[in-house]
Design a protein with these regions (language model features):
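Terminal low-complexity/charged segments
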Residues: 1-214, 291, 373-379, 383-384, ...
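Active-site bordering "gate/hinge" segments
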Residues: 135, 168-201, 209-544
Length: 544
């Protein structure tokens, strides 16, 4: 239905594909967003995507959108309603759009990402810095007219650390004022954790301001492993883009590729066979167990429980062996394809999965005996790193982190895909919001995933494992969105096509970025040792 504002409001059944996103002028953007947040209860900023629609041309049709802009996806956790809108400015020298970081906390990082890639300045943003690229990077690489290699030769020197940022203010006369702000005061004691620290689980750098052992502020730098995948996608055909999704959250390879394939299939009107839906759902749940077992092992190691570390890795190997037999890979599977899967199930697949289910159920109590009930583990996690439900929603912390804070945000329940509407399973929700609750959610989800697989494994229907596709795949012109419940939360895909064999824009709603964005809020007032437990239970994956 349409509101007076001209914004397209999606019904629930349109959750995974939308082709109409209405425009709103930048001057009215902030007031409209505030109205949607307060009156329509749009409290979840699902995605914020930067766009370059090009320079206006006299040959353009009157309705052709041009300029630099942003696409917003909003959802109400109260009513389930969803809204999508976009805005744009034609001034490429000084593109300015009102910030919504005062409405949704995750917009702080999302808008910094757009500024980093497109040079769009968000008026009212308190921390207008680059998010991923070096501070001395020249230009904005996601602009269609930018040549990154020309202005940025290979740099082999260390990046200088800056302690200042820009707060963008709007003056009463409508002009813009850049106010320089200090990230840390001269008297603050700041230490580096990372980028090469085992507890950051990858090349993540936290600059931590301490007062004794108490954390006062954290500045996260998550660009050390930035690879420009979204830029690369613009020069790849649709089948070629699939190879990169497995390499984002490498513990959610099946789920990531499932989302991208589903987005392209829905856009093209392709209906995959029931056999494919069953296979994809089973693989997604095996992937979830695989991820949660590694979560258990890594968290146990972080907190000093070396023996528990080996339990998770021992049993995870059984899943990787199953993956390898059917997919040919253990970590990077490359299994889902547009219209189906790469190959049919191995003859041993059903047998090995059916052997794994009772085995895992029978041994999970050992995990709890050795770690969950351990008084040291409980003292390190209970009451530590509390994230409120309101903050979880405002930061967009989906998955186990959101559900540990009382937010029922499971995509499999909200808008079922695959064959999740045919199985009975419980959405695990805790309300404590601390490290221990985040840990228990994932341990309980292992059992629920086993339950889902058990209901499907003996009922996989016959049928083709791959629909017949044209040699060159072209997606109809339009904008599309699809999402799945990844191991760490909602993994979303926003696709804008102009009818070519390559995507005009392909943006991923990462599961990990909101988790990293929330670390500063969660850790304030905690001890530095608590940062290790908090980071471990948030379960972010850095390349994501």
């Amino acid at each position: 239905k349409r509101e007076e504002t001209g914004i397209y409001e999606m019904k629930n059944e349109e959750r995974r594909i939308m082709q109409e996103i209405q425009f709103i002028v930048p001057a009215a953007l902030h007031d409209e967003m505030l109205r949607l947040r307060n009156e329509k209860q749009m409290d979840f900023l699902e995605s914020l995507t930067g766009m370059d629609w090009g320079v206006a041309d006299e040959k353009d049709a009157p309705e052709k959108l041009r300029g630099l802009g942003v696409v917003y996806h909003l959802e109400s956790t109260v009513t389930g309603e969803r809204i999508a809108l976009k805005t744009a400015v034609t001034d490429r020298e000084r593109p300015e759009i009102p910030s919504v970081s005062d409405i949704w906390k995750i917009a702080d990082f999302y808008e910094r990402e757009v500024f980093d890639y497109y040079g769009i300045v968000f008026v009212g943003h308190p921390d207008m810095r680059r998010l991923y690229l070096r501070n001395d990077w020249v230009g904005y690489p996601m602009r269609k007219d930018n040549d990154p290699e020309k202005d940025n030769p290979l740099c082999m020197t260390n990046e200088e650390t800056f302690d200042t940022t820009q707060e963008i203010e709007l003056n009463p006369d409508g002009t813009i004022k850049n106010r320089e702000m200090k990230l840390f005061g001269e008297e603050e004691y700041v230490v580096n954790i990372g980028p090469q620290h085992p507890a950051t689980h990858g090349v993540m750098r936290f600059r931590v301001s301490l007062e004794g052992e108490i954390i006062r502020k954290i500045d996260a730098n998550c660009g050390y492993i930035h690879r420009g995948i979204e830029k690369m996608n613009e020069s790849l055909t649709y089948p070629q883009t699939l190879a990169l999704t497995d390499r984002l959250d490498y513990l959610g390879a099946h789920q990531n590729r499932h989302a991208l394939c589903m987005c392209i299939e829905k856009a093209m009107g392709i209906e995959v066979s029931d056999r494919v839906k069953y296979i994809r759902t089973i693989m997604d749940e095996l992937q979830r167990i695989d991820s949660h077992l590694l979560f258990y092992s890594a968290l146990a190691m972080d907190l000093g429980a070396l023996t528990a570390f080996f339990y998770g890795f021992r049993d995870r190997e059984k899943i990787l062996d199953i993956f390898e037999e059917t997919c040919g890979g253990r970590l990077i599977m490359n299994y889902n394809t547009i219209g189906g899967v790469q190959a049919d199930l191995h003859p041993n697949f059903v047998k090995r999965v059916k052997e794994f289910i009772p085995y895992m159920r029978g041994i999970i109590h050992e995990y709890h005996d050795i770690f969950t009930g351990n008084i040291i583990a409980q003292s390190r996690m209970k009451g530590v790193g509390v994230l409120s439900r309101e903050d979880a929603i405002s930061f967009g912390c989906t998955g186990g982190t959101g559900r540990a804070s009382g937010w029922a945000c499971d995509v499999r329940k909200r808008i079922p895909y695959g064959v999740y509407d045919k199985v009975d399973f419980q959405e695990i929700v805790y309300t404590e919001g601390d490290c221990f609750a985040r840990y228990l959610v994932r341990m309980d989800e292992i059992m629920e995933s086993l339950k889902i697989i058990e209901q499907l494994i003996d009922n996989i229907p016959e049928g083709p494992y791959q629909e017949k596709m044209k040699p060159i795949i072209r997606v109809p012109e339009g904008s599309y969105y699809a999402a799945v419940e990844g191991s760490r939360g909602e993994f979303g895909v926003f696709l804008e096509s102009q009818g070519d064999k390559m995507p005009y824009r392909l943006h991923y709603r990462a599961t990990g970025l909101p988790l990293v964005a929330a670390i500063d809020t969660i850790c304030r007032g905690a001890k530095i040792a608590d940062l290790i437990a908090i980071g471990g239970t948030l379960d972010y994956v850095v390349p994501d």
